[in-house]
Curated annotation (Swiss-Prot):
The keyword Zinc applies. InterPro entries: DNA-dir_RpoC2_beta_pp, DNA-dir_RpoC_beta_prime, RNA_pol_Rpb1_3, RNA_pol_Rpb1_3_sf, RNA_pol_Rpb1_4, RNA_pol_Rpb1_5, Rpb1_funnel_sf. The keyword Acetylation does not apply. Its cofactor is Zn(2+). Keywords: DNA-directed RNA polymerase, Metal-binding, Nucleotidyltransferase, Transcription, Transferase, Zinc. One of its GO terms (cellular component) is DNA-directed RNA polymerase complex. Binds 1 Zn(2+) ion per subunit. HAMAP family: RNApol_bact_RpoC2. This is DNA-directed RNA polymerase subunit beta'. DNA-dependent RNA polymerase catalyzes the transcription of DNA into RNA using the four ribonucleoside triphosphates as substrates. Gene3D superfamilies: 1.10.132.30, 1.10.150.390, 1.10.1790.20, 2.40.50.100, RNA polymerase Rpb1, domain 3. It comes from Prochlorococcus marinus subsp. pastoris (strain CCMP1986 / NIES-2087 / MED4).
């Protein structure tokens, strides 16, 4: 058996002197006890325990053989049994219908309470959900009992029960009920799926069911990715944690407390930090002993409540963990081996179960009830609260009135009648609920109280729910509500209820009035069906001629022509082309304009309606444009529409024919600078249209462009004449001399040219176009209103090209366009101009263009009664073609009454229109006949079942309207309970329709406990995220002082600290105080509810301890408290999901997160303020300071999330391979960092053997060889970190462990001058040695041979008083 242990472990564990002995005691070859026979069912859990026991007792081989046999056994019987599932195996328990019936009865009762206004909407919802949750649980029990008693060998039951496949929650859905589902927002739908998959779901249930199914699939997909990333970050942060030492020798430890007298598995495999004695002083566990299950049991039986154990959290090994602090390796239940990569194991252990955690759980109302114990009376008696009791009224989440204890006290039930019974005593904790009154007589088995475990002041958050009205009518408040106007910081005014009370809606027929409608009947008037209740009129804004259009849909359009303009001087000519209809306007003198719009379209002011087709300004070819002096244009943002002429003048045009081609040069049929006649073929198949000089542009033997320029070429060698002209060209006026022999009697455009024949001038003729100052327009007639919009036609001349522009074209171009645009004045922007055609009055064959501005009024058609507007009847007050003035009524709409009743108008503020009115109908009232005198009076509000008169009860809810001796008239109403602080959306007397919001209930529900869970919560903890709306923590110990403010809600919270200074704490909206006045609090304690910000907690703990203890102790203690908190929080998440992880794994990760401190003040050290550095390093530096008398560095501990900790590691290779590669490498290069390749990652990247497992011994040997002739510099297994304790010859001072920073003088005091003087006085040659006491060692080689302290130097320093004797 022993030989089954791998050989390598003996090599790695070579430092354990008694490892062999241990080995034998842990793994006996045969059990001492004879085999025992156990007759019980072995399910999944029992199988797990069996294999685990075999492995721990008998080792790998025996366990493997046993597991193999068990497998064969299982398969053998599974083959014979032939287990399969058929539909018949899904047996629905008979109790199901009864259970569902009971639940429905409870819910009906709850709904009735809600209808009577006894509970709020929130309480109803919570109660319904709790009822179904409880029913579901009871149904699961019924399913279990049904299978157990009637069919224990049922296939489905066996599979789920043995753990082979499926679980109870799945079986429940198959044969119980599917249960409650959550919607995509995570809120529970209060309609449960009552059926199961065996019975089949209804359509509604199927749709609701698919919500949950989809959520499950999406969650699984996201969870896998999130969990993988979490594992990667954990591995990165902890990869360099390797067991490198036997024992770090720390005196620090952590405390493990027993839970209900039991330690469970929390002590197993941990080493005791001190001797553990029982109550009589006998030693149970010596110091540094591994606690195995039997020792753990012994501790429990000895009633030991807390044990100090060693932990990676308190291990003082430098950058690693020692064997004693880590304890057992859980793989083989032995002390961990040297070189074990415990960091990676920890990361895997925490990351791997990530996929098993749910992403989030949703809020199920009433979570709180499960955590509290209901106490019932055991005897009949009288309740006594005692003098200490402090209670206040409280309403439970289900709407039950109760009392809540504010302090802890003892409640007694004093027996009445029987003297033999003893009084029942109940310890009531603060926050517990009491369902009895002081002095009340009660029977036995009555619910007395609901005790909350511990002083749990629940962390709650505010949530809201809308109250929706489900009948139309008039709103009335109960007086108790006491609405109050509250103004928030932004100045918004809201109406809030101050007390719990009812908001009533009294039934009636409510009518919505259109915006401009006015009631025509006074209040309290009796109305019949068809009575006109209100009238709304529609009037014309500008007036004009009426046109009635055919009605479309449910409205009819009335058009009023406010302005029209007839283009009487133009004929409209229609021309059909293949691309569609074209329209032209022809004036009396024959000028033709192209119409840019078509009849029937709408145009806006300033739009061009037509262009003048003017052939006078059309050229034959392309060319160059020049403006003669005097011609000017307006500046325009864009040249798209041309340039508007501001001043007329002459436009000069130099023709030039340009062919843009893309052909091979071989196709060219003329030469560059050759004169050609019109019609010459210049390139194959391309002919010139004008005579002139050819210019050829080519690139890479490809023809690009051929230009033909008109004019005559004159050779000229005279440089003086040539210098007057450029290649771009220049205009020459008539009579101006150019060259001899050339007379110019017109304007010429002269260009300098160089041809193959020589230099010369090209004289080009210029065409002149005269542009008038304004375009000529035929006369127009138009109608102008006295008031309102008017129209005008305007002609605009636009030049197509700017001065100096070259138009490359063969075809002609249009140089000037004349546009006709329409302008409207005094029109509103939304008014458009309609284009119409009308026949000429004298000649019907001629059509004219008419431009009109229309005012369009939509008139509602009659409607037969709808739910909110009633019946409407609309009458037109005008006829077709009638002329109306501005303000004349066009149509009136009447709102007609639907049923007979009495009209009531709401109270309105003067100047505000009435938007709704109500008719109280006969069916909204109930007449209740009575014989005796009524016990109610007019104005009283009653609910179903209230007494009206002797023997007569109300049959409905509502308000008493009339009381006589024979009858009572009740107006039907509906009460809605609103809780304090609810926001009221309606005022007393408002009229509401069905579906309107009445109020917004503000209620408290448990916070975060059941909102963020599973993976996101783990991530939040390990990344040390700052939660939103975190709680306020006490900064320093002291006594709480709570003062009520002037305003009801405002409370001031302060703490009187030890030195009598007062710290005030600013409370945020909705924060509940968790402490009471006069309570003693310590730093880091919760003052208000909410999630804890771990960074704040560390700050508060450190700030408080810093005043009481030395800096180093305060830092260690505050870090230690935070570490325990973090470990417990992470464990809680995993435990809540049923995942078991050993504490030590989480401790390794948390150790990495809390190992750094931030330097606040460097003192005399060479550290930098703001630098993040290992706590150990600062400790060593400050120790050196205390020896040499320098000012120590001041620091604060910091908590880093796993990502940040990974990036802040000493190894830049590891950090760069994780995230932000460029930044990490750049910074490392600038700082000139060295990577000491301590972790696994760095070594893998470089390609070296990793310093763990079998590579660890090589690592130690390598370090030993580095140490050279001073092997004692290395501690026993320091894992490569020189331990300076061994550098202590008799004559040295007590040397500190020196920090790891660059080699420079550490100190400013004593100064370099002091040292120099001391050396000189004692005759020490400064070049002969390097002083360990005065210099900072190198980063890795902490002390080399020549750095050993010089005895003469040290004696000299002591004489000078600069060093105290160590």
């Amino acid at each position: 058996m022993t030989s089954s242990k791998p050989k390598k472990s003996s090599r790695v564990r070579k430092t354990t002197k008694n490892s062999k002995k241990n080995h034998n005691t842990m793994m006996p070859l045969l059990p001492k006890t004879p085999p025992s026979f156990k007759n019980k069912v072995v399910d999944k859990k029992a199988l797990k325990n069996l294999v685990s026991w075999a492995y721990k007792t008998h080792g790998t081989a025996v366990t493997a053989a046993m597991a193999d046999n068990l497998k064969d056994l299982g398969f053998k019987y599974a083959t014979q049994a032939a287990v399969s599932i058929s539909v018949n195996d899904l047996k629905v328990p008979e109790a199901k219908q009864d259970l569902i019936g009971q639940a429905e009865a409870q819910i009906t009762a709850t709904e009735e309470c809600y209808r009577l206004g006894e509970i709020t909407e929130v309480e109803r919802h919570t109660k319904v959900i709790d009822t179904w949750t409880e029913t579901n649980e009871r149904l699961v029990d019924a399913v279990k009992n049904n299978f157990n008693q009637n069919d224990p060998l049922n296939s489905v039951w066996m599979m789920a029960n043995s753990g082979a496949r499926g679980n109870m929650s799945q079986v429940r859905q198959l044969v119980g009920m599917r249960g409650l589902m959550a919607n995509p927002q995570g809120e529970i739908i209060d309609l449960p799926i009552r059926t199961n998959f065996r019975e089949g779901l209804t359509v509604t249930e199927y749709v609701i069911s698919s919500y949950g199914a989809r959520k499950g699939l999406v969650d699984t997909a996201l969870r896998t990715a999130d969990s993988g990333y979490l594992t990667r970050r954990l591995v990165d942060v902890a990869q360099d944690v390797i067991v490198r030492e036997e024992d770090c020798g720390t005196e620090r430890s952590i405390v493990i407390n027993s839970e209900d007298g039991k330690f469970g598995s929390r002590l197993i495999g941990r080493l005791s930090a001190e001797d553990i004695l029982d109550s009589e002083g006998n030693l149970i566990v010596p110091k540094n002993t591994a606690i195995d299950p039997s020792l753990s049991k012994t501790l429990e039986t000895s009633l030991i409540s807390k044990v100090n154990i060693r932990s990676p959290l308190t291990c003082e090994a430098n950058r690693s963990v020692c064997r004693k602090c880590y304890g057992w390796a859980l793989a083989h239940n032995h002390l961990v081996d040297l070189g074990e990569a415990v960091g990676i194991i920890a990361a895997q252990s925490i990351g791997e179960p990530g996929t098993q955690l749910t992403m989030r759980t949703f809020h199920t109302g009433g979570v709180s009830t499960a955590e509290s114990g209901v106490v019932r009376s055991k005897i009949k008696g009288k309740v006594e609260f005692g003098s200490k009791a402090k209670i206040r009224g409280y309403r439970t989440p289900h709407g039950v009135e109760a009392k809540q204890a504010e302090v802890d006290f003892l409640l007694k039930i004093i027996p009445t009648g029987s003297i033999t019974n003893k009084a029942q005593k109940i310890e009531v904790t603060s926050g517990s609920l009491l369902f009895v009154e002081d002095g009340q007589d009660i029977d036995s088995d009555i619910t007395v109280a609901q005790i909350t475990s511990g002083a749990v002041k629940k962390s709650v958050e505010k949530a809201t729910k809308d109250v929706i009205c489900d009948l139309a009518g008039e709103v009335r408040y109960d007086k108790v509500i006491q609405p109050k106007e509250v103004t928030d910081r932004q100045g918004n005014i809201t109406l809030k209820a101050q007390r719990l009370g009812r908001l009533w809606v009294l039934a009636g027929d409510v009518y919505n009035l259109p915006p401009n409608a006015k009631p025509v009947v006074s209040t309290e008037t009796k109305v019949e069906q068809g009575t006109v209740l209100a009238e709304a009129s529609q009037s014309s804004e500008f007036g004009g001629e009426v046109r009635l259009r055919e009605s479309v849909g449910d409205s009819r359009e009335v058009q009023i022509v406010t302005t029209s303009m007839l283009l009487s001087n133009f004929k409209l000519i229609e021309e059909s082309t293949h691309s569609g209809e074209l329209f032209h306007l022809e004036s009396n003198d024959g000028t033709i304009y192209r119409l840019n719009t078509s009849p029937g379209s709408k145009i806006s002011s300033g739009e061009v309606i037509a262009d003048l087709a003017d052939e006078r300004f059309r050229t034959k070819t392309g060319g160059l444009v020049k403006y003669a002096p005097g011609l000017s244009v307006k500046k325009a943002r864009s040249s798209k529409n041309g340039f508007e002429v501001s001043q007329g003048g002459t436009l000069l045009w130099i023709p030039q024919e340009t062919h843009e081609i893309n052909k091979d040069i071989s196709l060219l049929m003329t030469e560059d600078m050759e004169w050609i006649e019109a019609g010459t073929e210049v390139v194959k198949d391309i002919f010139s249209q004008t005579s002139g000089i050819v210019t050829v542009t080519q690139k890479n033997d490809i023809l690009r462009e051929i230009t033909v320029r008109n004019g005559s070429f004159h050779e000229c060698e005279d440089e003086e004449i040539l210098s007057r002209f450029t290649e771009e060209g220049k205009l020459v006026n008539p009579g101006e001399k150019i060259i001899d022999g050339v007379d110019n009697d017109e304007i010429l455009f002269v260009q300098k040219l160089e041809t193959s024949k020589g230099k010369g001038l090209l004289l080009r003729t210029v065409e002149e176009y005269t542009i008038p100052n304004e375009a000529e327009l035929p006369e127009l007639s138009h109608v102008k209103q006295e008031k309102g919009p008017s129209l005008a036609l305007k002609a605009i001349q636009r030049l197509s090209y700017k001065d100096g522009e070259l138009i490359k074209s063969v075809e002609g171009v249009e140089l000037l366009k004349t546009n006709l645009s329409i302008e409207s004045f005094d029109a509103t922007p939304q008014m458009t101009i309609d284009v119409e055609t009308i026949q000429d009055k004298s000649d019907k064959s001629i059509n004219r263009l008419n431009l009109v501005i229309l005012e369009s009024i939509l008139v509602r058609r009659d409607t037969i009664s709808d739910s909110s507007h009633g019946s409407t009847h609309t009458e037109l007050q005008i006829n077709n073609n009638q002329l109306v003035k501005a303000g004349d009524v066009i149509a009136t709409t009447q709102i007609l009454c639907k049923e007979r009743g009495v009209l009531q108008l709401p109270d309105s503020v003067e100047g505000e229109p009435i938007r709704r009115l109500i008719v109280e109908r006969n069916e909204d009232k109930i007449k209740i006949n009575i014989k005796d005198k009524a016990v109610v009076k007019t104005g009283d509000r009653v609910v179903d079942g209230d007494l009206i008169s002797k023997g007569v009860k109300s049959t409905s809810c509502g308000e008493i309207e009339e009381v006589s001796s024979e009858y009572v008239i009740l107006r039907i109403g509906r009460p809605y309970m609103v809780s304090p602080d609810s926001v009221l959306h309606v005022k007393d007397g408002d009229l509401v329709l069905r579906g309107d919001g009445l109020a917004l209930l503000v209620f408290e529900r448990q916070k975060t406990g059941d909102i963020v869970q599973g993976l996101p919560r783990i991530e939040e903890l390990l990344e040390a995220r700052r939660p939103r709306d975190s709680s306020i923590l006490c900064k320093k110990s002291g006594v709480v002082q709570i003062k009520e403010g002037t305003d009801e809600e405002s409370v001031s919270l302060s703490v009187i600290e030890r030195d009598d200074s007062i710290s005030e704490y600013q409370l945020l909206m909705g924060q509940n105080i968790m402490v009471s006045d006069g309570q003693q609090v310590t730093g880091g304690e919760l003052l208000t509810d909410g999630p804890i910000n771990p960074h704040d907690l560390l700050d508060c703990l450190f700030t408080d301890l810093k005043d009481q203890k030395p800096l180093m102790e305060a830092a260690q203690e505050s870090i230690s408290k935070l570490q325990r908190k973090m470990v417990n929080e992470v464990q809680n998440v995993y435990k809540s999901q049923g995942v078991a992880i050993s504490d030590k794994h989480i401790e390794v990760i948390v150790r990495q997160m809390t190992s750094k401190v931030r330097i606040e003040d460097a003192g005399d050290t060479t550290l930098l303020p703001g630098e993040l550095i290992e706590l150990r390093q600062v400790e060593d530096t400050n120790q050196a300071m205390s020896i040499t008398g320098g000012a120590p560095a001041e620091f604060t501990p910091v908590l880093l999330g796993i990502t940040k900790a990974s990036l802040n590691t000493d190894s830049f290779i590891s950090a760069a391979s994780f995230q932000e590669t460029t930044r990490v490498l750049t910074e490392a290069a600038i700082e000139g960092k060295s990577d000491w390749l301590r972790g696994l990652k760095e070594n893998v990247i470089i390609g070296r053997l990793i310093p763990a497992g079998t590579g660890f011994s090589g690592f130690v040997e390598e370090l030993a060889s580095e140490a050279g002739p001073h092997p004692d510099i290395l501690a026993e297994e320091s894992g490569g970190y020189r331990r300076t304790q061994n550098l202590r010859p008799d004559y040295t001072v007590d040397m500190p462990q020196t920090p790891i920073v660059s080699s420079t003088a550490i100190l400013d005091d004593p100064s370099d001058e002091d040292l120099e003087t001391t050396r000189n006085r004692h005759g020490i040659d400064p070049t002969s040695s390097n002083f360990a006491a005065f210099a900072r060692p190198n980063a890795e080689n902490q002390f080399s041979e020549d750095q050993l302290p010089d005895p003469a130097a040290l004696e000299g320093l002591q004489e000078e008083g600069l060093l105290s004797d160590g």
